[in-house]
């Protein structure tokens, strides 16, 4: 769960590729991006591009792919099954942006993106053969499921005003939740993130715990 949810999703797809919040050595980037394949949503390129070009550009407005204004379950899970978001937000300008960062034109990352299902199923099968069904189920399948639930919880709850507090008057409805932040690797310091979207840490106060921010400091060394 730590490798998939924290290293792969929160740090890799979200802060590193999605927001260019920090830099790291290439070999660490490779490991981090490999972990991101087990995100529970699917292919890695679309998630990054939709999040950046759709959600942050139109947060809680028309065009936001996963705003709870369209309903809780839409924001929680079903949005990424709607083809229109892929059509609207994956355009040439966005592709060029990520080509410059060596993401979508990297042959290895193209392989991860195009074969994400085979990699997920293959890893589960290999873990079963080598270590037994317990490792496959509780180690891999649960890790993928927990990562999906983690990210879905952030996208749904963190834009309800009753769920937390705001440090900044942003144009969206994002809020922070200290307890939720501990459980989601720092991602529920969401109002802070929408104010400083390219910061490597979402914490703005000693009482706001951002595990991902701590891990990033270690990865940069």
Q: How would you describe each model-predicted region?
A:
Residues 1-153, 157-158, 198-221:
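Non-catalytic, topology-defining segments of multipass membrane proteins
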Residues 51, 191-194:
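Acidic active-site catalytic centers that drive phospho-/nucleotidyl reactions
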Residues 98-107, 163-189, 196:
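Active-site-proximal inter-transmembrane loops
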